[in-house]
Amino acid sequence: MNIHEYQAKALLAQYGVGIPRGGVAETPAEATVIAQRLGGEIWAIKAQIHAGGRGKAGGVKLAKTPEEAGEIAKAMLGSRLITHQTSLEGKEVHKVYVEEGLGIEREYYLGIVLDRSLEMPVIMASRQGGVDIEEVAKNSPNEIIKVAVDPMIGFRPFHGRKLAFALGLAKEQVGLFVDFCTSLFRLYVQKDAEIVEINPLVFTSCKRFVALDAKISFDNNALYRHPEIVAMRDLSEEESSEIEAGEYNLNYVKLQGNVGCMVNGAGLAMATMDIIKHEGGEPANFLDVGGGAKPETVAKGFEIILKDPNVKAIFVNIFGGIVRCDRVANGILEAAKIVHVSVPVVVRLDGTNAKEAKEILEQANIPNIFAAPSLEGGAKKAVELACQGGAS
């Protein structure tokens, strides 16, 4: 689960992490009042959306008067911001964050993520702050410093000092930096975060480290332990189809392609998307229906996929382990009666009773449902049908 920058900074403040003073505005008048209250000579006006790259897209601007802050907020509020992390439609701006300007001496990057290969959290830092860390990793990988933290030991001052020395911090900065990292890691662990990212982390003219921007994402599976985090959820930032899928225990993520995918198991779902791309197509979604693949579940999956007007064909890829393929085949036919499936459906079933399942689909003789002989053949057929605009 993602939260907004202003919410992330409120959490950081609770853990003693330095942040600039600021306030949230939903109207231009509120933005003007907040700037007046903060005082100073310059303010940053930041669009609040769940996506990075706001600065390049015009979602972060500076104002030199409170009145200008209101004018900038007026232009941002209600507009749609398109960044490299949004869809082509972008995200509508409902709130802006008005923040005091700071005297900045140096910018850094600091982040905490789980390294699955090491099976432990890793703190990453870089002297190249304020830029896209993915670009730094691609173009200057040596500029990223990584320190793994054994969860059996936890974060210790020596971890912070190792990062500080690698960043070339001055002697008087090291202790401040270690304290900053200690607080950040405590938040990461106690709130069950997946990512805590400060970009940029700045050292100010007042000689302190401050989180100038912040991104925090949380583990959905741990949200039951954090009702205070759940209360921060902004449904307007999420795809309505993804919210609906969650209500039926379906894992759905909307993508930009035209081949709908319905698969059981997250690993198989990712492999299915890969083979669709390998065959020259583009997946329209990630959809994991789980282990059951019951008629109601399949029907709801079809319904959600077909809400995307870009979908021109659907590839159903089910591996029958515990669930029998013949039951899945009957479930697909029952689902087709419940939901009007307006595009061709290619079905690949493998595993327990796969032969019987293929016979069931072939005997049903439904014009737009095709039994695929293999994973490769199914993906190729789905891509071909999608390229034909769904014509079977």
UniProtKB/Swiss-Prot annotation:
Source domain of life is Bacteria
Q: Does the keyword Aminoacyl-tRNA synthetase apply?
A: no
Q: What cofactor is this protein dependent on?
A: Mg(2+)
**Binding positions (substrate):** 264, 321-323
Give the catalysed reaction(s), semicolon-separated. Answer: succinate + ATP + CoA = succinyl-CoA + ADP + phosphate; GTP + succinate + CoA = succinyl-CoA + GDP + phosphate
Cofactor annotation comment: Binds 1 Mg(2+) ion per subunit.
For this protein, the record's InterPro entries field holds: ATP-grasp (IPR011761), ATP-grasp_succ-CoA_synth-type (IPR013650), ATP_grasp_subdomain_1 (IPR013815), Succ-CoA_synthase_bsu_CS (IPR017866), SUCC_ACL_C (IPR005811), Succ_CoA_ligase-like_bsu (IPR005809), Succinyl-CoA_synth-like (IPR016102)
Gene Ontology molecular-function annotations = ATP binding; magnesium ion binding; succinate-CoA ligase (ADP-forming) activity; succinate-CoA ligase (GDP-forming) activity
Q: In which pathway does it act?
A: Carbohydrate metabolism; tricarboxylic acid cycle; succinate from succinyl-CoA (ligase route): step 1/1
Keywords from UniProt, A to Z, are: ATP-binding, Ligase, Magnesium, Metal-binding, Nucleotide-binding, Tricarboxylic acid cycle
Q: Kindly state one GO CC term assigned in the UniProt record.
A: cytosol
Pfam families from the UniProt entry = ATP-grasp_2 (PF08442), Ligase_CoA (PF00549)
Which sites bind Mg(2+)? 199, 213
Please state every residue range assigned to the domain named ATP-grasp: 9-244
- GO annotation (BP), single: tricarboxylic acid cycle
Q: Which residues bind ATP?
A: 46, 53-55, 99, 102, 107
The family assignment reads: Belongs to the succinate/malate CoA ligase beta subunit family.
| Function comment | Succinyl-CoA synthetase functions in the citric acid cycle (TCA), coupling the hydrolysis of succinyl-CoA to the synthesis of either ATP or GTP and thus represents the only step of substrate-level phosphorylation in the TCA. The beta subunit provides nucleotide specificity of the enzyme and binds the substrate succinate, while the binding sites for coenzyme A and phosphate are found in the alpha subunit.
Indicate the quaternary assembly: Heterotetramer of two alpha and two beta subunits.
Instruction: Name it.
Output: Succinate--CoA ligase [ADP-forming] subunit beta
Q: Source taxonomy lineage?
A: Bacteria, Pseudomonadati, Campylobacterota, Epsilonproteobacteria, Campylobacterales
